Amino acid sequence: MKIAILSRNSKLYSTRRLIEAGRTRGHTVRILDPLRCYMRIAADGFSLHYKGKPITGFDAVIPRIGASVTRYGTAVLRQLEFMGTYTPNPSDAILRSRDKLRAHQLLASQGIDMPVTVFGDNPDDTQDLLSMLGPPPHVVKLNEGAQGAGVILTEKASASRGVVEALRGLYANFIVQEFIGEAEGADLRCFVVGDRVVAAMRRQAADGDFRSNLHLGGTAAMAEASPQEQDVAVRSARALGLAVAGVDLIRSQRGPLVLEVNSTPGLEGVEGVCGVDVAGTIIQHLEQAIR
């Protein structure tokens, strides 16, 4: 099998592990920087070039597209899809996952529970909008933020209004959510491949923070996801059209709540903490999908 990995940095842990896993299983693996890809689109067919040469013959492509190049990266991925290349995470699924509002609407439409979320535009509606959440604390999130960036905890109603008004002044798109205090700064990252959770880890926020992202100083430990949590994680990935996903849940008094579905989840944390060959499992999924 000939596999392409769309990645801007071949030295990143996740990219290196996917290369290693693919080659260990006897496949040809090539890294393509999406920003060096360019394309021809016409009624007589699709073509893709990379550094002056045509790209052909790939059986599968694994997208490792960073948030900063989402639009161009997904355009390249879409071109490969039209050329008949299989991908576990199609371009439209990645775009769904990176639009928090759209993702939450899709999840809610499938009956998947999450923190109550509100979205509005007019400043005259701010007070009523926030009242739909109940009393603070509230969590304000940039709609396309990633890795904990653009996430603000407001502990007073005046602070919630102030942050909302400031973001509107910057013409930023954002959502506001209820704060789940009983989670105590912890979440559960479930790594989904295909139709199952292959690994799970509990992430704990650093002292003084409520965001559990590891690169922000959070810690992680291997965890066991309950059958209900596994079901929610798999359904969440499926709702967005993803076959490979990191689904972040919090454990609440009303059951597991989905915070986010990540279409480009890092492998270093989960493989290091859980001792699971997640990269190999992804390659196995490709093998099964294109038989």
Swiss-Prot record:
Q: Which residues bind Mn(2+) 1?
A: D248, E260
Entry's SUPFAM superfamilies? Glutathione synthetase ATP-binding domain-like (SSF56059)
- Which cofactors, if any, are listed as required? Mg(2+); Mn(2+)
Q: Top-level EC class, please?
A: ligase
Per the record, its GO cellular-component terms are: cytoplasm
Q: Identify the residues that bind Mg(2+) 1.
A: D248, E260
Give the keywords, sorted: ATP-binding, Ligase, Magnesium, Manganese, Metal-binding, Nucleotide-binding, Protein biosynthesis
What does the cofactor section's free text say about binding? Binds 2 magnesium or manganese ions per subunit.
Q: Where does Mg(2+) 2 bind?
A: E260, N262
Q: Where does the ATP-grasp domain lie?
A: 104-287
Which residues of the sequence carry a binding annotation for ATP? K141, E178, F179, D187, R211, S212, N213
Gene Ontology molecular function, alphabetical: ATP binding; metal ion binding; ribosomal S6-glutamic acid ligase activity
Q: List its EC numbers.
A: 6.3.2.-
Binding-site list for Mn(2+) 2: E260, N262
Output the Pfam families linked to this UniProt entry.
RimK, Rimk_N
Q: Which GO terms describe its biological process?
A: protein modification process; SOS response; translation
Would you identify the family this protein belongs to, as annotated?
Belongs to the RimK family.
HAMAP family linked: RimK (MF_01552)
> What is the protein's given name?
Probable alpha-L-glutamate ligase
Name the source organism: Xanthomonas campestris pv. campestris (strain ATCC 33913 / DSM 3586 / NCPPB 528 / LMG 568 / P 25)
